[in-house]
Amino acid sequence: MRKLSVYLAVATTLLVVAPSFADDALTSDAIILKLAPAHKTRAVGSASGGLTAEQQAFIDSLKGRKRQIVVEERTELTKVVKEAHLPTVDLEVYFDFDSSVILPRAVPTLVKLGQALSSDRLKTSSFLISGHTDAKGAPGYNQRLSEARAGSVKAFLVGNFHVDPRQLISVGYGAEDLKDPSDPEAAENRRVTVVNLVAP
């Protein structure tokens, strides 16, 4: 807890004296706009998107889960997010090499994320926090590292912004879901993705 408070103090300093560390284009308001459900008058589970009752039940079964999510569940989550067109944002979150320790230059981005998730528009939603690596290294190692990094982001949000941990599902995908499949080792594949799991 103390470590997370230190992160927040560092973030305040970085935002004031070193704005070059932050992604100036990605404000907390911009994150809210990306993650807020669209208000549409369409049937849930229609071709245009939305969660079916079965998909919602699956997501609900993962909330507050003590054990690690298994391969089949990860695959199903990916399928649900894509089929339902759930609101998503990709973030660059920097960690120590070969580690799940959040670097100081990543803190401003996580502060903006925390402000967004605790805002009035999003505070009742549930979110998937997924960690991704590039294709360098052994698959098993990448999987464990991505799980640990997603867990670090979740801990930051819970510790600093009092986001209900039951509203956050942290999952590691390793190199299973590359952002740029044409270049498996590209830096853009190393990312954290946040998805709003409330049906739009």
Language-model region placement:
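N-terminal targeting leaders that direct proteins to extracytoplasmic destinations
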Residues: 2-84
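Surface-exposed acidic loop/strand-edge motifs in secreted or periplasmic proteins
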Residues: 76, 80, 90, 97
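Short coil/turn segments at secondary-structure junctions
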Residues: 93-101, 136-141
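Periplasmic peptidoglycan-binding/anchoring modules of Gram-negative envelope and division proteins
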Residues: 95-130, 155-159, 194-200
